[in-house]
Amino acid sequence: MHNNFYQEDELLNNELSNRGVLLTKVDDVIGWARSNSLWPMTFGLACCAVEMMQAAASRYDMDRFGMLFRPSPRQSDLMIVAGTLTNKMAPALRKVYDQMAEPKWVLSMGSCANGGGYYHFSYSVVRGCDRIVPVDVYVPGCPPTAEALIYGLMQLQKKIKRTTGFKYDARKNH
């Protein structure tokens, strides 16, 4: 009985694909669209921001991954925290993060953003931006190369594709 069902299902799929019809899950389509159309907002705080600019320039060309830098948090779904986060700047980071629309992701770039880095023991430095905002991907290095940033972005794309469920609460965003 089960064998017959799977054979009929396979025949139907083959017949539809011959007619140019694609069968897939909504979660897969949403994951594909979200991962290939990230709009990052820069939060460049130190020297890591220079490497982020290099990754966006013509040699590495982040646009080919569907990424378009946006100046406003309301138009962004990815925040790249690049550099040393100080105690004075932490509330601004949280405020900008809260202004971003759902779904949103954070990439922590460099040793200083990941854990305080060279300034870890300074009284004025936050020991990792994950104490202020939830971080999805960490890119190590001081400063990390443009290749490392692009690799981190590719890992984030994989993570987004694995995310299931179309979660949207109109009451929360209204």
Curated annotation (Swiss-Prot):
Pfam families: Oxidored_q6. It is found in: Cell inner membrane. It is an enzyme of class 7 (translocase). It catalyses: a quinone + NADH + 5 H(+)(in) = a quinol + NAD(+) + 4 H(+)(out). InterPro entries: NADH_UbQ_OxRdtase-like_20kDa, NADH_UQ_OxRdtase_20Kd_su. Keywords: 4Fe-4S, Cell inner membrane, Cell membrane, Iron, Iron-sulfur, Membrane, Metal-binding, NAD, Quinone, Translocase, Transport, Ubiquinone. It is a peripheral membrane protein. Binds 1 [4Fe-4S] cluster. One of its GO terms (biological process) is electron transport coupled proton transport. Belongs to the complex I 20 kDa subunit family. NDH-1 shuttles electrons from NADH, via FMN and iron-sulfur (Fe-S) centers, to quinones in the respiratory chain. Couples the redox reaction to proton translocation (for every two electrons transferred, four hydrogen ions are translocated across the cytoplasmic membrane), and thus conserves the redox energy in a proton gradient. This is NADH-quinone oxidoreductase subunit B. It comes from Rickettsia bellii (strain RML369-C).
